[in-house]
Amino acid sequence: MKLLFIFILSSLILTSPVFAYEVKESTDKYTYKIDIYETPFLNVNKKIKDWLDEKLEEFKQYENYNDIKNDFYTDYELHEYNGIYYLQYFIYSYTGGVHYFLINNQFTYNKSGEILELKDFFKNDNYLETLSKLSYEELVKIGANEDKNWLKEGTKPMLENFSLYYFDKEGLHLTFPPYQVAPWASGPIKIVIPSSKLINLIKPVDN
């Protein structure tokens, strides 16, 4: 069963109110509860809907493979700075095992409804190499993990290693999910790359 989303017919100007609502279901095999943050933009809402639909359908497949009641729920964070919105989604899925499985995704857009990517904020194409170096240095500085090889692996210059981010006056905030740079018990690891280290690297983005 697909998620039912109600979309507001509005222009692509940030005038319509955004709102959050909940979609949930419970059966003998599974329970899911999805908190949905709806933006004023149909294209952004569709992107969110398609991703949530896909992950929910994947989760439901497990009802045929185990004898436990599976669980699926979501959370999100919204950050805004200079007319840019960073909507970070987190899916917690339990289908057996020691703990929940975490899936995350980010939807970045401006106040005109244009969807943005991390590369849009940087002047040069080698920005991932720069982020790899700077994030590794910050993680070492805060003592995120004594295993330096783990840190290096989790900060390799690959886009998936920098999927949760937002900019503000302090600089670039990065979140590394559990297991990426440290054990599960450490939880998400958050760092800030100061603006002073990015001043010659980032470019203005239309908001």
Where are these regions (language model features)?
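Compositionally biased intrinsically disordered regions enriched in Thr/Gly
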Residues: 18-106, 110-207
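Sec-dependent N-terminal signal peptides
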Residues: 4-15
